[in-house]
């Protein structure tokens, strides 16, 4: 519910900014592109302020239920730094788009999409190097398991790194990150400390599955499919304000992008769930441990206090992973077939 309220707050804040934000351009002497970038950052600032109370409420709930041990001040600083990263990304995106619009007033969207994809690929490439508190695997048995699993999935030598998250607490996590030579698996230290070896193997095999099946590249391809129609709609909607050649169109453009991404949420979550299901299946095929897989998902569900079988609307709008029951049923189906 908090996530839904935060989304409503975001849409309301951006809707008001789209209606009134153009007037801020009159106060700027930063030039056409500079003013557009400032308006973009201002819009994200309004969104951050609107969502901040809901983030605090979510943290309070997690602390109250023992999911997180992070302090409020630490969380606020982290959230502010995360917002800074978003400011950087939106500024770079507006710099690219408005520069292209200066050359092709109404065809900018055709050239902007590949340029934005290149930026997204660059961010994906460097992201593993920007994560804090990272170190190599120190457990020789886990390291040996990781090497064996990576080789079994056709990606030998793929590194595994550990992220210290002792200040965050909560349910353990892991992720596949990077592109090409930067790709790797990141596991939280809480996973290694609190889960048995068989379940750690399942997690590692799942994350290696994302890499061996090129899910990050597929994610970029999916982004391209979304960006092209979104950019075209932005061009059509902002045309009365001069298109993205004019900085006064930036507040409306941001609102349109967020609304379109919201409307595409069911497609995005379905795509993500499909990739996660494939990684689950790869893990089962690699580890041959359906019992450990079922135990893993049950334990993660208890730690994170998530619904094993959430309502359909929640699944469509909020769930980018299969439900716990769906993942357990897959493990049972694998066992029945083998």
Model features per residue range: what roles?
Residues 1-244, 258, 262-338:
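Polar-ligand-bearing catalytic/cofactor-coordination segments
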Residues 245-254:
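N-terminal signal-anchor/signal peptide hydrophobic helix marking the start
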